[in-house]
Amino acid sequence: MQKVEVFRIPTASPDDISGLATLIDSGKINPAEIVAILGKTEGNGCVNDFTRGFATQSLAMYLAEKLGISREEVVKKVAFIMSGGTEGVMTPHITVFVRKDVQEPAKPGKRLAVGVAFTRDFLPEELGRMEQVNEVARAVKEAMKDAQIDDPRDVHFVQIKCPLLTAERIEDAKRRGKDVVVNDTYKSMAYSRGASALGVALALGEISADKISNEAICHDWNLYSSVASTSAGVELLNDEIIVVGNSTNSASDLVIGHSVMKDAIDADAVRAALKDAGLKFDCCPPAEELAKIVNVLAKAEAASSGTVRGRRNTMLDDSDINHTRSARAVVNAVIASVVGDPMVYVSGGAEHQGPDGGGPIAVIARV
């Protein structure tokens, strides 16, 4: 029987492993039982954000030392998903998922379960296209099996780290006579995120295979997953996948619930996600209920219309600050205003992740 524990740890810098080290040294975390680390790092979240790789390297080197294995073995064992960009009041932090094998009976109902899977490395010309969609769909099903989740309806959040195109990778494709989905390296992040999200939707039966095509990726915004959260980075060539849901094959003291924000200021969806995770309240959650929250995970996106509820904004027109950065700041502030804590995970760029301008939101909470 699996028992999943989740630890949210603030960080003082991308290479700060002190909080994790304290929990390991105190015996609260067995490093051999860590299956995934999800983080928010204080870079720009764009192509040249190397805080993601810096954080991953620092964590992997530390765990390699503690486990007595190589760094290469660590990154094959643990999914490291670092999302850059902590604009506004968002607090840099990591969320550590620990999965134990225990000789305990299952708890009443369904409890938190987590599974991890990795796709193969992608060629540059495969990013943002059906090759990526189909491979991600395969890996999501593998992660569900790893989590012992049988029903797709029990999956509440699928976090993915996916690759992007660089000038070097684009040139590599051209030398081999191949074309890439887009020559703009920043836009390639959107295509990779979008294809990965549609892979989630395909795996979970949210969208049928006949509706997904190369032409639909980053064009048909009616196609989306309600539980996918994808983040692109320069530090990898494959997709790393964490499936989080509830299972009868779990003795965890935690559960996860979710909702979907219809736009960047949808506080009602935040409260709906809290209730789906088991929090009890009428209008506003009281302090004793908020204390049950382990973390909130969400996506943020500027609507393609350039408006929110009919009011114009300039996120898409700002040449100085990319719209994903503004969107992260807004959504983090909305969530923080409801839960009373700015240390929540908000990732920018929600292509095919929730409706246009909105995005999935999930809450992990203690029972």
UniProtKB/Swiss-Prot annotation:
EC number: 3.5.2.15
Gene Ontology molecular function, alphabetical: cyanuric acid amidohydrolase activity; metal ion binding
Active site: 161, 231
Substrates-to-products reaction catalysed: cyanurate + H2O = 1-carboxybiuret + H(+)
Location of region: RU C: 254-367
Keyword Hydrolase: yes
Site description Important for substrate specificity, residues in chain: 324
Residues noted as binding Mg(2+) in the record, renumbered to the chain: 301, 350, 353-355, 358
BP terms from Gene Ontology: atrazine catabolic process
Metabolic or biological pathway: Xenobiotic degradation; atrazine degradation; biuret from cyanurate: step 1/1
InterPro entries assigned to the protein according to its UniProt record, in alphabetical order: AtzD/Barbiturase (IPR014086), AtzD/Barbiturase_RUA (IPR043008), AtzD/Barbiturase_RUB (IPR043006), AtzD/Barbiturase_RUC (IPR043007)
Activity regulation (UniProt): Inhibited by barbituric acid.
Location of the region described as RU B in the Swiss-Prot/TrEMBL record: 111-248
Sequence segments annotated as region (RU A): 1-104
Protein name per its UniProtKB record: Cyanuric acid amidohydrolase
